[in-house]
Amino acid sequence: MMRSGRRGHLKQVATLGMGSLLPSSLFFHEILSYTKSQRMTQQNSPFYHFRIGAIEATVISDGQTLFPPHPLYAVNTTGEEVINALESHFLPTDLYRLQCNTLFLAMGNEKVLIDTGAGNTLGPGMGHLILHMSKAGIAPKSISTILITHCHLDHIGGLMHEGKPLFPNATLYISEQELNFWQAKNIDLNSMPIEESFKTNFKKAFHDNILPLNDRINTFRFNEEIVPGIQAIETTGHSPGHTSYWIRSGSDSLLHTGDIFHHPAFDLEHPSWATAFDQDPPKAYKTRRKILDMASFERVPVMSYHMPFPALGHIFARGNHYGWESAPWIL
């Protein structure tokens, strides 16, 4: 179902200079300072209840942080194109509002959480998962299973706090490919055009949040059913073992896509645009096009971790571009 015109997009992705670093204005500590300088107040509910067949599901926000939008989330295009994309979506052109949204699934005796937020790794706007779970009436100790899409810091940073597990009764599931990459003696992040201190924070997040839970980790291979009703789908490229999850109950389903795409104005509408955090940009692009084609053609309900809250919707195709139809808010 891959659409025509992708060769030109692949060429654009392939020309990305992986050896170059982002401008010094995007150094990690300055990103955090940028976040702190912005107004980051919560105005609305941080959780959203819905159903997938017999499954009681809840999207829970971990919070948000702010980044300069270019080139971090559109490395291989121009600042002018990014401004045009943001303006076409009626969005500010001087900042990118990155949201993190976890998914809780009540499946009988199984209480499943997909990803855990950023914890303390991305400044004060993030790391609110536990607080927001309590507002939704969900106890961390009730979580029996945690599914990790990939081991980037904004997905695993909420596993531990001050050396103690925040989900004391949970078993973790991580793809075998992903865990093998991050457990290597020398973790190779050279393909990511970000400053070295940012790479160090990625490695530290894995060391602080995954390694202490080693005796609770189970690995899986792609296409396996992790728990009844949830299947692991290979969507590698953004990370070496990036996993999406098919969630099925009766005739209903939801595809959790993790970080295949990040924002309607960027790598959804322009799937060839790579982020600085794509570890294999050409492969990430191929995966993105494959999943976007499938989701739009089959009209599959989707949850995407970084999409604007509640991060639920449908993908529709517009030639070589795609759009996002957000799920209607249900009171």
Where are these regions (language model features)?
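N-terminal export signals
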Residues: 2, 8-31
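C-terminal segment of N-terminal export signals and the immediately downstream linker at the start
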Residues: 24-59
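Conserved beta-strand hairpin/beta-sheet module of binuclear metal-dependent hydrolase folds
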Residues: 46-136, 244-259
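Divalent metal-coordination and catalytic microenvironments
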Residues: 54, 105, 115, 143, ...
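Active-site metal-binding loops of divalent metal-dependent hydrolases
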Residues: 62, 116-119, 151, 177-178, ...
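Active-site metal-binding motif and surrounding structural segment of the metallo-beta-lactamase
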Residues: 124-173
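Metallo-beta-lactamase
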Residues: 127, 134-138, 142, 176-234, ...
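Cap/insert and terminal regions of metallo-dependent hydrolase folds
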Residues: 250-331
